[in-house]
Amino acid sequence: MQVIVALAALGSLAAPALGFSIPRGVPVSQSMIDVKLSSTGNSMVKATITNNGNRALNLLKFHTIMDSNPTRKVSIESEDGKEIQFTGMMPTYKEKDLKPSYFIFLPPKGTVEHSFDIARTHDLSRGGKFTLKAEGMVPIAEENGTEITGAAKYHSNELHMTIDGEKAASVENAFGIVKRGPLTRINKRTSIDMQSCGNNQELQALTAALKASAQLSSMSAQAVSQNQDKYMEYFKDPQYMQTVQSRFQAVAQESSSTTGGGTTYHCSDTMGGCEEGVLAYTLPSQNEVFNCPIYYSDLPPLSNECHAQDQATTTLHELTHNPAVQEPFCEDNGYGYERATALSAEKAVQNADSYALFANGKLNLITLMLIDPD
């Protein structure tokens, strides 16, 4: 299936821009990219990405079919139409200062292939017939550049596979069962794995981020019904107001619960998921959240810039990925302000960054800084 590619000049951003943000008003060109899925083994899948256009493209790998991390690249349904549980990671990437190594260069008419084993991130031990498909959006930079100037939406073909369950079960899962140290409920909120906190500074930063996440989420829940223009900017359709409000309330509860939360939060990476560029990640199948070193070194506790990344809203973002907070848990359908606000209402209400960006809006930031300047 073909993909619509959007390109724009570098200086044409009409709103605060992040590394993954897609400029507003971007002109839509002809279909230029093709994504095809094929089976190359029992549970092995090959994605073939072809540039059908006449200009070279630099494609960002993060949160796409080309991501080298064990992220959700395809949706998988069994023969009876049930979705197969995803057991991989949902990372939050740093959106600024993107490196050339984060991109794949695709010359005109060029093709790149990316293979992955779906048994590493899904339980396929029952075996049988499955249907796979992939869809998403690839941020694009100009040739030899790293500043995002456009995006390509993609919808792959449907791939039908018959999988041997015993062989699939023999594939090592990308993440085993998380081993925790002693757990402590700081102010009776989400459990913090104390053994993962290498120093007191990390624990203090995480505790402060959870406090800010609770406050921002609580204020956002109120803003959903009090500021309809702001709500519509991010979530598009009034019919989802109650869903959005209840999710913010659930995140606020999880961040500062008086009855005990359902997630475990780790100050540091104990599962090996902190690859380059990852700020934090969640294992939704286990309700576990992990911070990475650059969460502490590269993010402020709370940004005074609207729609910028910080520790508080990164933590809020991660908590929306956990089914113990609210089901169905949020996906990564659109990253950054421009991509998030371009989603359909159905996609936005299930998009983690839509909640983080809404909470990080100017009104909430000013209010939080006034009531909690420290």
From Swiss-Prot:
The keyword Chaperone does not apply. The active site is at E318. Pfam families: Peptidase_M35. Its cofactor is Zn(2+). Zn(2+) binds at H317, H321, D332. SUPFAM superfamilies: Metalloproteases ('zincins'), catalytic domain (SSF55486). Residues 20-189 form a propeptide. Keywords: Cleavage on pair of basic residues, Disulfide bond, Hydrolase, Metal-binding, Metalloprotease, Protease, Secreted, Signal, Virulence, Zinc, Zymogen. GO terms for molecular function: metal ion binding; metalloendopeptidase activity. One of its GO terms (biological process) is proteolysis. InterPro entries: Fungal_M35_metalloproteases, MetalloPept_cat_dom_sf, Peptidase_M35. Its EC number is 3.4.24.39. GO terms for cellular component: extracellular region. Probable secreted metalloprotease that shows high activities on basic nuclear substrates such as histone and protamine. May be involved in virulence. Belongs to the peptidase M35 family. This is Probable neutral protease 2 homolog TRV_05367. The lineage of its organism: Eukaryota, Fungi, Dikarya, Ascomycota, Pezizomycotina.
